[in-house]
């Protein structure tokens, strides 16, 4: 019952904002799946719901989510990855990332992994160029033709925006201060 209302709410907001089904679903799920979510026929896992809702410009922190066992296990795996990176256990983090990658091919999860790998790369001294490539790989999980110079043309979730912000940070670190300043402005203007 709860998913019916949350899916219907996504549909109502999408329709109010005149966003096409395909535009909102781009890279996250099929348009048929989104239509089933909006009609209440199908529920969405938390990461998918959050991404759809955030692409509509809404905050997901007001929702309480009940996770099934699989979602809960994936959440714990993401927490373990973050803890390993934060605690400097980089080889453990790599193992956790590899195990997570084997367990899923979902674009949102792959995007998360690219962001985690980039953080790991930064902490272990990888080049700025390699980090940029990893971040672009992540954003292109959902937007294959993504153009960093035109972020206003996309509906971005919080995870996607984190990729963009980190990418611009890498541009700044590579010495392209003027380009980074322009892109930071684009991020601030993003609505």
Residue ranges and their predicted role:
Residues 47-62:
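DNA major-groove recognition helix of helix-turn-helix/homeodomain DNA-binding modules
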Residues 9, 75, 79, 109-120, ...:
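"A position-specific structural signal for the A-helix of alpha-solenoid helical repeats
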Residues 65-66, 99-110, 140-158, 189-191:
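Flexible helix-coil transition and linker loops at the boundaries of alpha-helical arrays
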Residues 16-36:
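Short alpha-helical DNA-recognition segment
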Residues 65-92:
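Short, charged recognition helix plus adjacent turn
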Residues 82-99, 124-146, 174-190:
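Helix-turn-helix repeat elements of alpha-solenoid scaffolds
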Residues 1-16:
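A short, Lys/Arg-rich alpha-helix, primarily the initiator
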Residues 73, 108-110, 130-131, 153-156, ...:
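Residues that mark the junctions of alpha-helical repeat units in TPR/alpha-solenoid scaffolds
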